[in-house]
């Protein structure tokens, strides 16, 4: 049983790593895109840069 448990935990960690890499790549693509569009909108609404960065850090 010990052997089975070990192999199971290993597969889990591998799955997590793959998932993280994919999400990071996707977010980079979107940022990009979003930055070009939202730069003007942000200034109009008066968003602070510090606040936005804090939200981002919490998410990822």
Swiss-Prot record:
Transmembrane segments: none
Matching PROSITE patterns: PROTAMINE_P1 (PS00048)
GO molecular function: DNA binding
GO CC annotation: nucleosome; nucleus
Classification via InterPro entries: Protamine_P1
Chain intervals for the UniProt region annotation (Disordered): 1-60
Tissue expression profile of the protein: Testis.
S-S bonds: none
Compartments where located: Nucleus; Chromosome
BP terms from Gene Ontology: chromosome condensation; sperm DNA condensation
Top-level taxon in the UniProt lineage: Eukaryota
Keywords: Chromosome, Developmental protein, Differentiation, DNA condensation, DNA-binding, Nucleosome core, Nucleus, Spermatogenesis
Function: Protamines substitute for histones in the chromatin of sperm during the haploid phase of spermatogenesis. They compact sperm DNA into a highly condensed, stable and inactive complex.
Family: Belongs to the protamine P1 family.
Protein name: Sperm protamine P1
């Amino acid at each position: 049983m010990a052997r089975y448990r070990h192999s199971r935990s290993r597969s889990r960690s591998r799955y997590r790593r793959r998932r993280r890499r994919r999400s990071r790549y996707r977010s980079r693509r979107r940022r990009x895109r979003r930055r070009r569009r939202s730069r003007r909108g942000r200034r109009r609404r008066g968003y602070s840069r510090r606040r936005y960065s804090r939200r981002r850090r919490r998410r990822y």
